[in-house]
Amino acid sequence: MKATRTDTMKNEIKYEKSELELMTTYQLREICRREKIMNGVIHPLDKEELIQTIMRYMGKRQDFLICDRKKGGEERVEEFLKNTRIVIKPSEELYCQSQILAYEGLSIEYYDGYTIPYKKELSGTNAFLMGSDMTLCAILNLKEHGGRQEKLYLTKAAELETRETQRKDYRIFCMGRQNSECMYHLYYGEQTILPEHIEVYSIPLIDFVVRKPVTLMLPMAIDFGSVNTTAGVYLDSAYFEHVGQQAAVKNCRENEINYTVFEDGAGESMLLPSVIGVLAVEEEDDKLLFGYDAIRLANASYVDEGFCVFYDVKRWIGEYDKEEEIVDRQGRRRLVKRAEILRRFFLYIIRKTENRFKCRISQVHISSPVKQKHYFRRMFREILPEYMTDQETMLDEGMAVLYNTISNMLEQETLEENEEYEALIIDCGGGTTDLCSYRFRIQDRRAAYKIYMETTYENGDTDFGGNNITYRIMQILKIALVRATGNQNVSSVKEILEYMDTDIYRFIDSHGVKAFYQYLEQEYQKAEETLPTRFADFERYNRSEYYKVKNNFYTLFNTAEQIKKLFYGKVGALEVTVTSEQKEQRENTVLLDKWKLSFWKGNSLTVEKMIPEVMMNYFEIELLLSGEIYGIVQKFMEELYHSGRIQDFSFIKLTGQSCKIDLFKDALKEFVPGRMIQFRKRANIDAADFELKMTCVDGALKYLRDRKYGLADIHLNNGKAVLPYRITAYTHNGKEVVLVDGIKDWDTAGTISRNMEDLILPLYLKNADGEEHCRFQYVCRQEDFSQKSYEEIEAVYGSHILQKETDSIENGDVKFFVWAEQEEWGFQVVPVYCEMDELYLGKAEFFSFESDNWVNSFFDGKK
C-alpha cells in the first residue's frame, strides 16, 4: 500500500495520517528511511510512535484555502480561468441556493446557510464564483462544519473582494484537491507550472448580489473577561428593514439583544476564550490567533515543540504599555506592546460581530472593572480611538449587572417609586472576584424613568476566580495520573480527600484556607518529581525539555477545564472519565492526549504510552472546591456580617460564570438568609447556558438602548471605594509607618523623612491582615529636584502637600509625600527637599497597586 501524498513546489512528499494508519510497521520504517527521518530509523519505535514522527516532519497540510488578500492574486486566477481549457464534469447531484448575498468587506460563514451536497473530494477546497463572461466575482471555500458530512458550506474571507456583473448569470466552479491546491499556489504567486486544462464541477447560480452593510445606531457591548469574553448588539426594526430575511439573520430577534457567536470546533459558542496565540512572527504583520484558534494552536504542537500562547490577558490592563516577547514555532521572536496585541484581539471580536450581523460597528462599549474604571477607559481610548463611545456614560461591570436587574424589575413591576434600594453584587469571574455595593432609586416621570445609581467598591481578590477552581481540579488530576502510572510515593486522591473531609467551614474559620489545602499542596509537590509542570524551572534546560514541561502544564490545565465544564455546565454529570484511548462513544468522557505528557524516566523526560483511565466524581470535586469557595465568601462577608451592615441590603446578587456552582450559595447561607440571594440556576440547563456570563452584556445594552431612545434619564455616581491595601515604610530607627491606609481613610497623604543623599526608599504593599504582597522602590536623586515655592507646589498637588508639612522639613532632609489615587488604582510618591530654607520639588512617581510583580498568575510556569 502506498501513502497518499502531495508533491509541492519543492517536491516534498507530504503524508496523510489516515493512510499511514493502514500501513504496517515495516512500511512506516521504510518511509522514515526514504525521507531521512533519522528519529524513526535509529530508535526502535512502535507503530504509533512512527506515525507520530512521520506526521511531525512530513505530515500533509490539510487544506490549501485562499483566505486573505494577495496583491495580483485575483487577476492571476481570473486570467488563468479565462485562457485555459475548462472541462465540465457531470454534476447533477450538486446544487446550491439560487441566490447568494454578500456584503462588502464582510465574510460569508457557515451560519449564512449557503451549502452544496457533501462530496468528499471537494471538502477543504477552493471554489470560484464566475460571471457568464468569465469574470471572477468571488473566491469561496468549501468546508465541513461540526463534524457532519451531510453538506459542505460555502464560505468567504472578509478580505477577499466581491463583484457583480451586468448579466445575472453565474456559476460556481468546484474542483478536486489537486486542482484547488494548484489554484492556491497560483493565487499566492507560488506556482509556475500550470496545467493545460482543468476539470471542474459547474453549479449554476441565478443571481449574486453584493450590498453595503448597515451601520448600527447603538454601540456594540463587550464584556472582557479573564477567561472568556462575550459580545452582543441590540438589533432594532430599522436594522431588519435593511438586511431583509436572509439566512444570516433568520434566527436573530427583532428589538432585542443578540449575541456574537464564535466557532469552537464542534459548533458555536457565545463565549470566546480570552486567549491569544502567535502563529507567525513576520516583519510586515505578525499573524496572531484568538480564542479557540489560539487554544487549537497550543493543542496542535508536538510534545517538545515550541508555542507561544497568552492566557489571562485581562491582567495586562494594569500595565498595558509594557512589551511582551512573541515567538513562533520557527523560533523567530520580537517585542510587541501589550496594547497592540489587545487592540487586535478586540478588532477580531468587532469583525466577528460585523460578519455575524452583516453590519458596521461605529461605537463600542466595553465594561470596565469597578476598581480600575478610569485606567481601563484610558487604555481603550488609546487602543480603540475610532470606536470609543462617550467615556463618562460608560458603565463598569457591576453597574451593568445592576442595570440589567433594575430593567428586569421594572418590566416585572416589582420596584417601588422613590424607595432607595441597596444591593450587594459578588462577581466571580475567571481570574478575579469583586464585591461592590450599590444604591439605586427610580422615579416614574411623564416621558421617561429617572434612575439614580451609585456604586462603591467594597472588596476584591485579584487571585481568586474560575482559574483557581480549574487549578484545584488539575492538582487532583496530576496526582491521579502519577499514581496510575505506578508512583506509590504520592498519596492517592482518596487519601487526600479523606483528610479534607471535615467540618470545612469551621476548620477554615479557625485555621484558614492554606491549612485546609496543605496536604494537597504537599502531595502535589511530590507529583512534580514524576510529572513536571513548573516550566519556569526549566528555562535553563534545553529547548526540548522546556517545551515538554510547558506542554505538560497546558495539557493538564486544559483537561481540567473540560472536566470542570462537564461537572458544572451540565446537570447530571455525576462522574467524568479521563482516558487516553479513543473508545466507544461514552458520555462525560475527556480524551487526554498521551503524546503531550512527558514523565521523568531516570534522567530523561519520556512519553508514557500506557496511561490508565482516571475517574472523578461530582462529590469528590465538591469536597475539593468547598474550601476555596467558602474562603472567598468568608473574606467578603464576615466584616459585613459582624458589623450588621449585611441587613441593610435589599438583595445579594451572584454574577460571573463561576457563581453557577451551588457551593457559592451554600457558603453565603452562613452569613445571610437564603431568600436574600439572587442566584440563577434553572433545572435541566446544559453546557450552552451562559446566562450568568451574559448578564454584563445584557445590562450594558439595555442601558445604551434606554439612553438612546429616551426611555430613561440615568444619573451615575461613584462612591468612595474601600481600598483593601496599606502602604507602609520604615523610619531610620526601624519603626513601621502607615502612609496609606485604605481600610480606614485613604484620602490623606502620609509622610516619611530621610536625610538627603542619592537614596532608595523601600515601600511595602500589604493587605488588610498585614501580609506583605509586594515591595516597591522609589529612587531619589538630587539632579531630579528643582527649586519651587510652596505656592507652585500647591498649584500642582493641592491638599496632598500641606504647607504645615513642608514648613517642618529641616535643612538637608527630604520628606516623601505618599497618597492613593482612587481613579488610577495606585499611589503617588512625591519628594520635597529643603536646603538653605528653600524648597525643592522632586520627581513624582506612580505605582500601581496590582502589577505583574505580585499578582498571582496560573500561567507563569510556577504551578
Regions found by a protein language model. Give the residues of each.
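Hydrophobic, small-residue-rich alpha-helical packing segments that form membrane-like cores
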Residues: 353-360, 370, 376-420
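Gly/Thr-rich phosphate-binding beta-strand-loop-beta motif of the actin/hexokinase/Hsp70
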Residues: 209-242, 305-308, 314, 410-454, ...
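Basic helix-extension-helix modules of the SAP/HeH family
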Residues: 2-68
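Phosphate-binding loop and its immediate beta->loop->alpha context
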Residues: 68-182, 250-364, 368, 478-561, ...
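Helical "lid/coupling" subdomains associated with nucleotide-phosphate turnover
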Residues: 342, 470-475, 479, 517-715
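Flexible phosphate/Mg2+-sensing switch loops adjacent to catalytic phosphate-binding sites
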Residues: 237-271, 419, 446-459, 680-685
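Acidic, glycine/GT-rich loop-and beta-edge segments that sit at the periphery of enzyme/chaperone cores
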Residues: 65-191, 485-505, 678-807
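Conserved phosphate-binding catalytic cores of ATP/NTP-utilizing and phosphoryl-transfer enzymes
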Residues: 192-217, 393-426, 693-711
